[in-house]
C-alpha cells in the first residue's frame, strides 16, 4: 500500500487524473488500418560491422583521458540526496558520508 502525505493527496489525484486522461486520449485514436510497428528501424537496412574487444593493461593511459583522477581511480562528484525514513534507519549503509 502506498503511503501518501495528507497534504499531497489532492495533487496526486490531479496528477493521476491527468495520466488517465492521456491514456484515454491515446486509446481513442483509430488504428484500424495502421500496420503494427515492431521496431522504428524495421524499414532501415542496418550495416553490421565486426567488433573486437581487447584487453588493455595500460591503466595509466586510460586514466590520462580524465581530469578527475585520484589515487589511480576515476573520481565522480559527491551525490547529495535527501534523507528519507528508509535512509534514516539505514545510516550505516550510506556511502555518501564517506566521501
UniProtKB/Swiss-Prot annotation:
SUPFAM superfamilies associated with the record: Glu-tRNAGln amidotransferase C subunit
Subcellular location: Mitochondrion
MF annotations from Gene Ontology: ATP binding; glutaminyl-tRNA synthase (glutamine-hydrolyzing) activity
Any one of the GO CC terms: glutamyl-tRNA(Gln) amidotransferase complex
Broad EC category: ligase
EC number(s) stated in the UniProt entry for this protein: 6.3.5.-
Region annotated Disordered, chain positions: 78-99
Domain of life: Eukaryota
Keywords associated with the record: ATP-binding, Ligase, Mitochondrion, Nucleotide-binding, Protein biosynthesis
Function as written in the Swiss-Prot or TrEMBL entry: Allows the formation of correctly charged Gln-tRNA(Gln) through the transamidation of misacylated Glu-tRNA(Gln) in the mitochondria. The reaction takes place in the presence of glutamine and ATP through an activated gamma-phospho-Glu-tRNA(Gln).
Family: Belongs to the GatC family.
Further details from the record: This protein may be expected to contain an N-terminal transit peptide but none has been predicted.
Name of this protein: Glutamyl-tRNA(Gln) amidotransferase subunit C, mitochondrial
Species of the source: Dictyostelium discoideum (Social amoeba)
Lineage summary: Eukaryota, Amoebozoa, Evosea, Eumycetozoa, Dictyostelia
Chain's gene name: gatc
Amino acid at each position: 500500500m502506498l503511503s501518501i502525505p495528507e497534504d499531497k493527496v489532492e495533487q496526486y489525484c490531479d496528477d493521476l487524473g491527468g495520466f488517465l486522461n492521456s491514456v484515454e486520449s491515446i486509446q481513442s485514436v483509430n488504428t484500424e488500418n495502421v500496420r503494427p510497428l515492431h521496431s522504428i528501424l524495421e524499414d532501415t537496412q542496418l550495416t553490421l560491422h565486426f567488433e573486437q574487444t581487447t584487453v588493455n593493461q595500460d591503466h595509466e593511459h586510460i586514466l590520462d583521458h580524465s581530469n578527475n583522477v585520484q589515487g589511480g581511480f576515476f573520481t565522480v562528484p559527491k551525490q547529495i540526496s535527501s534523507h528519507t525514513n528508509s535512509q534514516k534507519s539505514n545510516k550505516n549503509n550510506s556511502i555518501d558520508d564517506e566521501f
